[in-house]
Amino acid sequence: MAANLPNMRSIRRVMGVDPGLTRCGIGVVDGYPGLARLVGVDVLHTPADAELGDRLAALEDGLVQWLDRAAPDVVAVERVFSQHNVRTVMGTAQAGAVALLVAARRGVPVVWHTPSEVKAAVTGQGRAGKDQVAFMVRRLLRAPGLAAPADATDALALAICQLWRGAAMARLAAGGAR
C-alpha cells in the first residue's frame, strides 16, 4: 500500500501569478501531478490613478509578502500574449517583470505559461472560457465553495498547470540535453 503514496520529495509548492497592474492574482498550491491542494489565494490591487512607480512598488510589496509567507519551490507566471490594447499588455508585462524580480531575489525559479497552455492543463481545452477555468480549478482543488475572482482562479490555474506539467517538462528538457 505504501507504494501508492507519493514520495514526500515529489510534493511541490507552486505560486501562480496572474500579472496585472490593477489586479494581480496570486494562488498557491501544494501537490504533485494529479493532486493539488489549495494553500492560499489573493488578489493584489493598485489604484488605476496612482503613479506607475507606486503601483509597481505596491505589487512588489505584496509579492514579497506572499513569497516569504508561502515559500514556494517555483513561481509560475502567465506569459504576456498579444492584445489589441498596448497599454494593457505593457501593464501585464511590467507586473510580470516585478514577479520575476521578486522571485529571483529570493532564488526561486520562475516559469512562464501561455494562457492556452494553462487552460489546456486544467480544462483539457486551450480555448476554454474563464468560467470553465474557474469551475475546474474549484473541482481540482476540491474547493466548490471557493469564492474568488477570475484573477485569483487564473493564478491558481497557473500553479496547477506548473504542478502537473512541470515535472514532465523538466524530464523532457533533461532528455533533450543528453
From Swiss-Prot:
Keyword DNA-binding included in the entry's annotation: yes
Report the principal subcellular site.
Answer: cytoplasm
Q: Where in the cell is it found?
A: Cytoplasm
What UniProt keywords apply to this chain's record, in alphabetical order? Answer: Cytoplasm, DNA damage, DNA recombination, DNA repair, DNA-binding, Endonuclease, Hydrolase, Magnesium, Metal-binding, Nuclease
Q: Tell me its cofactors.
A: Mg(2+)
Q: What is its EC number?
A: 3.1.21.10
Please list the residues that make up the active site. Answer: D18, E78, D151
Identify the InterPro entries for this entry: RNaseH-like_sf, RNaseH_sf, X-over_junc_endoDNase_Mg_BS, X-over_junc_endoDNase_RuvC
User: What's an example of a GO molecular-function annotation for this chain?
Assistant: DNA binding
Which residues bind Mg(2+) 1 per the record? D18, D151
Q: Which GO terms describe its biological process?
A: DNA recombination; DNA repair
Provide the residue positions that the database annotates as binding Mg(2+) 2.
Answer: E78
Q: Pfam families, per this entry? A: RuvC
Q: Which reaction does it catalyse?
A: Endonucleolytic cleavage at a junction such as a reciprocal single-stranded crossover between two homologous DNA duplexes (Holliday junction)
Q: How is the cofactor bound?
A: Binds 2 Mg(2+) ion per subunit.
Decide whether keyword Disulfide bond is in the record: no
**Listed GO cellular component terms?**
cytoplasm; Holliday junction resolvase complex
The record's listing under HAMAP family reads:
RuvC (MF_00034)
Q: Which family does the UniProt entry place this protein in?
A: Belongs to the RuvC family.
Q: What does this protein do?
A: The RuvA-RuvB-RuvC complex processes Holliday junction (HJ) DNA during genetic recombination and DNA repair. Endonuclease that resolves HJ intermediates. Cleaves cruciform DNA by making single-stranded nicks across the HJ at symmetrical positions within the homologous arms, yielding a 5'-phosphate and a 3'-hydroxyl group; requires a central core of homology in the junction. The consensus cleavage sequence is 5'-(A/T)TT(C/G)-3'. Cleavage occurs on the 3'-side of the TT dinucleotide at the point of strand exchange.
Assembly and partners are described as: Homodimer which binds Holliday junction (HJ) DNA. The HJ becomes 2-fold symmetrical on binding to RuvC with unstacked arms; it has a different conformation from HJ DNA in complex with RuvA. In the full resolvosome a probable DNA-RuvA(4)-RuvB(12)-RuvC(2) complex forms which resolves the HJ.
> In its UniProt entry, what is this protein called?
Crossover junction endodeoxyribonuclease RuvC
Q: Which organism is it from?
A: Acidothermus cellulolyticus (strain ATCC 43068 / DSM 8971 / 11B)
Name of the coding gene: ruvC
